[in-house]
Amino acid sequence: GSPVTQEEYNKIVETQLTELWSNYGKLFEIWFDGGVLSQQNGGADILTLIQRLQPNSIAFQGPYGYPNLIRWVGNEEGNSPYPCWATADATTSADGVQKIKGLYGNPHGNYWCPGEADFTLRRNDSFQGGWFWRANEDHLIFSTDELLLKYETSVGRNTNMLLGLVIDKNGLVPDADVK
């Protein structure tokens, strides 16, 4: 195909987000993996859309100016830094580009932007780091004790815990993962 302009791309993004944010009820969290290119820098008008269509959702690495932001803590192991402050400055909450100095938040930060510790139920040596299902990998599921430790190093350190589950070829969470 032929390349699209940034303007055409923005229209595609805005159309798709309008569909997703309009047809499936209230969303709890909207995930922007890698952050959001601001409108001032040529990106789509995400802020206006989210404020109009999903104003109560939490936005992971969402657009600058949105009041319900959460931020990445620097790894996908469920291991938040300590201490981990729920306030941050603009460099840790605005553009999705996490500066290492900002992983702890900022106790004097001007923005309420708590951390989120994401990790998968399956170990990182499984297919695609545990974010996607593949047969014969049930042995890579974390034990209850390991999950409790991840809870302590995420929620116990003042961050939201996001547990990534796989969906199998039938569109379901596998029985082994549910147990």
Pin down the residues of each PLM region.
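Mature catalytic domains of secreted/periplasmic carbohydrate-active enzymes
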Residues: G1-K179
